[in-house]
Amino acid sequence: MAELKLGYKASAEQFAPRELVELAVLAESAGMDSATVSDHFQPWRHEGGHAPFSLAWMTAVGERTKNLVLGTSVLTPTFRYNPAVIAQAFATMGCLYPGRIFLGVGTGEALNEIATGYAGEWPEFKERFARLRESVRLMRELWLGDRVDFDGEYYRTKGASIYDVPEGGIPVYIAAGGPVVAKYAGRAGDGFICTSGKGEELYAEKLIPAVKEGAAAADRDADAIDRMIEIKISYDTDPELALENTRFWAPLSLTAEQKHSIDDPIEMEKAADALPIEQVAKRWIVASDPDEAVEKVGQYVKWGLNHLVFHAPGHDQRRFLELFKRDLEPRLRKLA
């Protein structure tokens, strides 16, 4: 079994840049091994939302912490970004913070790409997935440090070189919500990312088996692939507060089609706020008892996940981190 790791999800859609940095610093002192950040150009919510630039945040946190592993969860290197430039950015961070940087990638959402000028119909999954695979190939070629002439279907480089690259390049984590991309993560990813709250069948019977299948097809050791899950947890000793804290993140309870196709945060907010709190809370582990919380988290370890990244929905993240350090972290370490 791979090493058990605990991480903190820095909610870039919810907090301003300076506050988000300070929270990551606190997360390290609370016992977290890693901190991940989403890369949104626009937030899920128009009112009260935020969208700081993820790579600037990672650099600021890197300077303020000693051992915290930092990565995106996730970034789309295929539309508003040129993957060659993302490869350069992550190579630079990898040189600044050796062994502490990874690139988490996904296929993208209209919310972030339409606003920045993507023209035409938002592509179907097939094209978005093809772009992702091609971008990963290009970035890895560039991280070898050689001059790269790349002539792909979507991306091209001519005599491109990245001059400052950490030894071994940058680990790439692939986000997957279904078995097709999970199999690709097993075949080509250094890590795999998924999110919680969708039932045992998805994780134990689809995602993890697909990762293992992909690894076997590529003659890789599946246990060497870091299997990360963003655990949506609203833990507070006050049960009413634990429930109400989930409200801000109602957009997560929209359908996958809505989340991938709505391109306006105002419309996203309207759709989310129409949901009852009971439906919103279904995506979360809502608990006021630490043993109950850890028991529910422990299911994901049994299903094959080893890197648990905790996403707390409340506005008082300092309170969550204090409670995490006091009540949850000691119990969670025993899951190993």
Curated annotation (Swiss-Prot):
Gene that specifies this protein: fgd
Any further remarks?
Answer: Exhibits Si-face stereospecificity with respect to C5 of coenzyme F420.
Q: How does activity depend on pH?
A: Optimum pHs are 5.5 and 8.0.
Q: Tell me the organism.
A: Mycolicibacterium smegmatis (strain ATCC 700084 / mc(2)155) (Mycobacterium smegmatis)
Q: Upper lineage ranks? A: Bacteria, Bacillati, Actinomycetota, Actinomycetes, Mycobacteriales
Quick one: which residues bind substrate?
Answer: T195, K198, K259, R283
- Alphabetized Pfam families for the sequence: Bac_luciferase
Descriptive protein name: F420-dependent glucose-6-phosphate dehydrogenase
Amino acids binding coenzyme F420-(gamma-Glu)n? D39, T76, T107, G108, N112, G177, G178, V180, V181
Report the gene knockout effect. Cells lacking this gene are more sensitive than the wild-type to oxidative stress induced by plumbagin and menadione. They display decreased ability to consume G6P and reduce plumbagin and menadione when exposed to these agents.
Give GO BP annotations, semicolon-separated: carbohydrate metabolic process
Catalytic machinery residues: H40 (proton donor), E109 (proton acceptor)
Q: What are the protein's UniProt keywords?
A: Carbohydrate metabolism, Oxidoreductase
Example of a GO MF term: glucose-6-phosphate dehydrogenase (coenzyme F420) activity
Identify the EC number(s).
1.1.98.2
The record's InterPro entries line, in alphabetical order, gives: F420-dep_G6P_DH (IPR019944), F420-G6PD/mer (IPR050564), F420_G6P_DH-rel (IPR019945), Luciferase-like_dom (IPR011251), Luciferase-like_sf (IPR036661)
Q: What's the catalysed reaction?
A: oxidized coenzyme F420-(gamma-L-Glu)(n) + D-glucose 6-phosphate + H(+) = 6-phospho-D-glucono-1,5-lactone + reduced coenzyme F420-(gamma-L-Glu)(n)
The source's domain of life comes to Bacteria
Return the SUPFAM superfamilies for the record.
Bacterial luciferase-like
The temperature profile of activity is: Optimum temperature is 60 degrees Celsius.
Description of how the protein assembles with itself and partners: Homodimer.
Q: What CDD domains does its record include?
A: Tetrahydromethanopterin_reductase (cd01097)
